[in-house]
């Protein structure tokens, strides 16, 4: 693992859930503006942040097994060097695992959905199925897939509340994503996040 960067916990701002739900859309076009570290922090916390001293997170997890790992390809975030980072929820920090950003490679592996390459960040949500299946057997696969859906919705809602756009991308070649990131977990979802073109 590379350098560790602590990222500030988000300030919780008042926003009506109903407003965010009404405004939530899938967005595939992003302008060239960078994200701020604060915005990155909010997105990661919403995805899988720790919410209390017992280790519970922002999403429900069968038996609190928390089988997911969140990686983020950083192309353009103010104050953060480009590269691929792993999110460490327990410390609300990111650790760089690749020195270069791989947005173009991710886009090609995702059936040439090139908007992925343009996004300032791309979340890669991957699963270590064994954390859940060793407790629940084959039913654990279902629970893992439910959990990634919870993460995706949280990212959608946080992005919307910040005036950003995102989309869930499930069309990609799994093994290519694993090879690009050099990870052992199984990728389930890509979520590019950026500023919407108005």
Swiss-Prot record:
Top-level enzyme category: oxidoreductase
Domain of life, per lineage: Archaea
EC number: 1.-.-.-
GO molecular function, one term: oxidoreductase activity
SUPFAM superfamilies associated with the record: FMN-dependent nitroreductase-like
Membrane-crossing segments per the record: none
Cofactor: FMN
Pfam families: Nitroreductase
Key words of the record: Flavoprotein, FMN, Oxidoreductase
Key word tRNA processing present: no
Family under the similarity heading: Belongs to the nitroreductase family.
Protein's UniProt name: Putative nitroreductase MJ1384
Organism ancestry: Archaea, Methanobacteriati, Methanobacteriota, Methanomada group, Methanococci
């Amino acid at each position: 693992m590379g350098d560790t960067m602590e990222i500030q916990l988000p300030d919780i701002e008042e926003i009506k859930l109903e407003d965010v739900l009404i405004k939530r859309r899938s967005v595939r076009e992003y302008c060239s503006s960078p994200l701020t570290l604060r915005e990155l922090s909010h997105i990661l916390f919403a995805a899988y942040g720790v919410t209390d001293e017992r280790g519970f997170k922002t999403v429900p997890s069968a038996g609190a097994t928390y089988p997911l790992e969140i990686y983020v390809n950083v192309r353009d975030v103010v104050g953060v060097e480009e590269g691929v980072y792993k999110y460490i929820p327990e410390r609300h920090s990111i650790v760089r695992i690749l020195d270069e950003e791989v947005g173009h490679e991710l886009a090609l592996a995702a059936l040439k959905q090139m908007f992925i390459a343009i996004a300032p960040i791309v979340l890669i949500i991957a699963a270590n199925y064994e954390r859940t299946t060793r407790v629940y057997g084959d039913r654990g696969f279902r629970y893992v897939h439910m959990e990634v859906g919870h993460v995706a919705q949280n990212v959608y809602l946080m992005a919307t509340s910040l005036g950003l756009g995102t989309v869930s991308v499930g069309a990609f070649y799994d093994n290519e994503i694993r090879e690009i990131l050099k990870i052992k977990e199984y990728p389930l979802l890509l979520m590019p996040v950026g500023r919407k073109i108005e």
